[in-house]
Amino acid sequence: MACTFEQILETIENLTVKELNELVKLFEEKFDVSAQPTVVAGAAGGAAGGAGEEKTEFDVILKDAGAKKINVIKVVRQITGAGLKEAKEIVDGAPSTIKEAVSKEEAEEIKKQLEEAGATVEVK
């Protein structure tokens, strides 16, 4: 029984955030690859030498949900588009990454929303 690419994509589309994370880890182990972007040697040297350069991509990390956990789950659902179960798993698994490689403005907006809901957030 052969699967078509469309069937594979449809299956992947229906995975939760947690399941997608596990799938990526399995790919990394099975094929001995990394999901991390490759850094060009010249670019790394330039970034280290130029302390004045501003970072353009940021990760938003939920450190703690705080006392208003339900409000934080609602905001996480809104931001990530995850279902209730997935959003709860993200919040319960803190510290966890909410969004990766977003602009500074988007990262600050997400941080503001989560902090207003009662969470402790870090932007890296």
Curated annotation (Swiss-Prot):
Native organism: Nautilia profundicola (strain ATCC BAA-1463 / DSM 18972 / AmH)
PANTHER family according to UniProt: 39S RIBOSOMAL PROTEIN L12, LARGE RIBOSOMAL SUBUNIT PROTEIN BL12M
Gene Ontology biological-process annotations: translation
Pfam families: Ribosomal_L12, Ribosomal_L12_N
Keyword annotations: Ribonucleoprotein, Ribosomal protein
Protein purpose: Forms part of the ribosomal stalk which helps the ribosome interact with GTP-bound translation factors. Is thus essential for accurate translation.
Keyword Ribosomal protein annotated: yes
Family, similarity comment: Belongs to the bacterial ribosomal protein bL12 family.
Highest taxon above the source species: Bacteria
One GO molecular-function entry: mRNA binding
Keyword Ribonucleoprotein in record: yes
Record-linked HAMAP family: Ribosomal_bL12
Assembly information from the UniProt record: Homodimer. Part of the ribosomal stalk of the 50S ribosomal subunit. Forms a multimeric L10(L12)X complex, where L10 forms an elongated spine to which 2 to 4 L12 dimers bind in a sequential fashion. Binds GTP-bound translation factors.
Name listed for the protein in its UniProt record: Large ribosomal subunit protein bL12
GO cellular component, one term: cytosolic large ribosomal subunit
